[in-house]
């Protein structure tokens, strides 16, 4: 599975979600998972930041694993790597 996420800088990054990862998609487009790998940073090689926590950094080929992933399916805004299923949805997301 591939996911797309907008960073604090407004850059859409691409992540792969590995087999075996927990993925919750409550409304069909916005999802969250416990594992991801950043595979593209929109042509940027520098560090990009989370729009939620600007201390959290994204780097190319970085593996992300959320240790305190919230296992409650019905809680959309909980701990996890949040992403959209399409690039277009991520681009439209207001950071």
Q: What residue ranges belong to the model's regions?
A:
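Short, glycine-biased loop/turn motifs at secondary-structure junctions and
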Residues: 1-95
């Amino acid at each position: 599975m591939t996911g797309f996420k907008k960073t604090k800088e407004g850059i859409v990054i691409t992540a792969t979600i590995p087999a075996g990862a927990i993925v919750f998609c409550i409304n069909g487009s916005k999802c969250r998972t416990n594992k991801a790998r950043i595979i593209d940073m929109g042509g940027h090689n520098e560090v990009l930041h989370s729009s939620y926590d600007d201390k959290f950094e994204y780097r190319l080929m970085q593996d992300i694993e959320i240790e305190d992933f919230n296992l409650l399916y019905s809680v959309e805004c909980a701990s996890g790597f949040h992403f959209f299923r399409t690039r277009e949805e991520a681009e439209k997301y207001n950071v």
